[in-house]
Amino acid sequence: MLKRVVRVLRCKLPACQGALRAGAALCAMLLLLAYSAPGIYGQVRERSQDYDAAQKRLAQGWNTWDVHSVTTQVLLPEGLAIRVALQRKTTLYGDAFLEDVLIGGGPGRLTEQVFPGPHAWDGSYTDARIVWRELDLRIQSAHAGKELVMLVTPLAKDKPGHLTPAVVFSASYLWNRPGTVERLADRIEAHGPSGTVPIYLAGTEAPFCDLPVSGPYLSSELKGPVGLSTGKRRSLEEIAQLVEEEHQAYEKTLGTPRSAAVDAIQTTLGWDTIYEPEGSRVISPVSRSWSVGWGGFVLFDWDTFFAATLAAIGDRDLAYANAIETLRESTPAGFVGNYARAGGWKSFDRSEPPVGAITVLGLYKKFHERWLLEETFAPLLSWNRWWQENRSAGMYLEYGSDGKNQPENLDDDSRGTRQGAIFESGLDNSPMYDEGFFNEKTHRLEIADVGLMGLYAADCDALAEIAAVLGKTPEEKELRERAKHYRESLATLWDEKSGMFLNKDLHTGRLNPRTSPTNFYPLLARAATPQQAQRMIQEHLLNAQEFGGDWVIPATPRNDPAFKDQNYWRGRIWGPMNYLVYLGLRNYDQAQVREELARKSLKLFEGEWTAKHHVHENYNSMTGAGDDVNSSDPFYHWGALLALIDYAETNDKPSPGDYVH
């Protein structure tokens, strides 16, 4: 074990080689300890029994577990995969073959179009339309007890004279799991530790053709619907009936009247949830395209906490998994990084906005399971203390990037830089940070950040409430005092003239008039008086020259010169910003404003959801479009927060007794 760790570190950390030669035993021991910390090179920290049981419940049965393709069905825990591929035979394209299908296409290729339809939490029903090389077809799947059925249906007739396209079902065991697959005369048989799974084609098998498939497969020309079943042979009619039964069961989960928000959230998380074999876990990365581009998975800090909140409307175990796995990726320094990616690497230099405690407390208030608090309290407290110890500047907090933290992520050029500090804010190119002094010695952006302190004080409040439930009185006192301190700090950043909390340049002492929705985050911390909240809302949030209008809430006010850029955090609308502002409004007697924000957020979301089933990373605040730029992933789960706002306002209104008076 020690030799393996040292060998890996010689490759990753060449600066350590001299130290190893000079004092091999001591250095190796220190490095081994560092890499044995939770979440550094795999998941070392053991799961609690409760959480292990939750993960085992999740990682069962057939579902779209494989990150590389939404048309692949995988049986867990065995790892048996049935991959659905398409062959297109034309003079124009040659014998084109599509084996991996991603929503929005994958890195470097944008050939297929996917219109994701319903996806049940447990994979009991999935439905997607695929458009590729002039093919237009529908792929559905359903559970038949513990077995799987699939139905592939052409939606349009092929052009006269074209060679008939084909669908190809191949089988294999993923992730080096034990098992063998063989082709028999009328079926495929997969033999694994839990037994044999026969796989049957319902359709006319195509004559021999040379396909780029490395294992046994079943193929049929797409002259009409084609089916597949496991366990036993089924007719096309039987398969179609089973698919429709599961479709109707899915519809019943949406309530009466049918909830578009529940449909959107369940579908989004359904398609974005994968099995991550490196950590033997079920998680919901932001999108499959992002994960494939990052080597298999990438967990961004606040993004994945929001995924936990989204999942809570229908899948408790998945909600827990997303929150807990984000915390299990904490660095040796005790904070949750900006990202954690395949291969065990993460942003050791920087964190991201602290929304963990409010997420966990929200889950506890919904499900009332104490073990969740016991599982998460220690890493949440460590992270909370890290902000105070590493990002405080007198009475304020500022963002930073500690580029010399070990181990250095050498392929991340932003570590230790101004851009790295801005990345810690989560607002990669916000005009709020166009100016401001970056201290090369402290690696801090010397700006007292209103948004950060609002989120942090809310984090302290939520964590104090968790500490109280767990009977941790000293920690509760510590956290309440810290929340009070930063509320008082925020009070010094109130600008009476503008009627807004403003960021402060700590290098010059000047307040920064450039704002974003983060300037409303003091509402989350109850740091604004009712009178201040009223001014912020009336003079800024509802002001059509700033954050109001038909499409809300822009990341940059409409009267800022950067608004016209409509480029990422410069002017576009982001689900998490709307959601956090909405949570802040719940602390005040602003029911009408909340309802308007919920209505407008849902209207924005429903535009591309209805037309294309897109859930965008961000949206144009002048047109409401999401697909007008390449920098807006079309199926990024936090876009569904726009629908969650309306769901919360409809189903979980705050009590007037909770308002700040």
Language model features: what each stretch is:
Residues 1-18:
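N-terminal secretory signal peptides that target proteins for export/translocation
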Residues 13, 26-261, 295, 587, ...:
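Terminal accessory carbohydrate-recognition/targeting modules of carbohydrate-active enzymes
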Residues 21-25:
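Sec-dependent signal peptide recognition
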Residues 44-73, 79-81, 347, 352-367, ...:
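C-terminal capping/lid segments that line or modulate ligand- or cofactor-binding pockets
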Residues 142-147, 155, 235, 239-293, ...:
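Catalytic cores of transferase enzymes with a strong primary signal for eukaryotic protein kinases
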Residues 212-230, 333, 337-355, 361-371, ...:
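The feature captures the catalytic groove of carbohydrate-active enzymes
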Residues 256-361, 365-366, 373, 381, ...:
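Substrate-binding groove/exosite segments of carbohydrate-active enzymes
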Residues 269-277, 315-335, 376-394, 482-500, ...:
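Long, well-ordered core segments of solenoidal/helical folds
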